Amino acid sequence: MNINKLAERLGLEPEDYMEVLELLVDSGKADITSLEQAIAAGSAEEVVAAAHSIKGASANLGLTELSEAAKDMELNAREQNLDGMSEKIQILKAKFEPVAALFQP
């Protein structure tokens, strides 16, 4: 992940991009928890909401792979299809982890 390139693409200074990215990480952690709970409860509506949140925030920051993983979950849940969501959330978490790792001590 090239922070300078992503920031430049959005017309931001790298420091400003990192501030916004940190907000995404904070909200993303909560959204992932919500996704896990929604999947366990079989709530397609809640999966849609949490996946949509991650999709939009990550797309706005140029994190295409993370956005696509969330989009896949959202589209399936919109069709009331929760099959394979356990695998899909693992893929999403794998895309999210490198971003979150930027803010770990």
Label the predicted regions.
Residues 1-49, 53-105:
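Two-component system phosphorelay core
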